[in-house]
């Protein structure tokens, strides 16, 4: 039996820049690192942007750094662009 893929979501601005405007993806991965690798496979070079330019929320809980954070089947993984300040 196949597990329900995670729902990976990007903001509109981020998706315009890196994924041709696509804001949602269904990705099968057990950890956040697996999600990032899968997205990098779909869009080469995207993994670096995800690691450097975003914070991630998994099922509504924000994780600053968490490559090994578990991603449960059916989870929502939302990449939030970091806000730069001055």
Language-model region placement:
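Ubiquitin-like/PB1-type beta-grasp interaction modules and other compact soluble beta-rich domains
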Residues: 1-85
């Amino acid at each position: 039996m196949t597990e329900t893929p995670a729902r990976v979501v990007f903001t509109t601005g981020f998706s315009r820049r890196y994924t041709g405007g696509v804001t949602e993806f269904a990705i099968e991965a057990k950890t956040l690192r697996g999600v990032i690798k899968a997205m990098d496979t779909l869009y080469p070079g995207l993994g670096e942007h995800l690691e450097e330019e975003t914070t991630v929320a998994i099922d509504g809980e924000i994780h600053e750094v968490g490559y090994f954070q578990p991603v449960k089947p059916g989870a929502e993984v939302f990449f939030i662009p970091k806000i730069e300040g001055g």
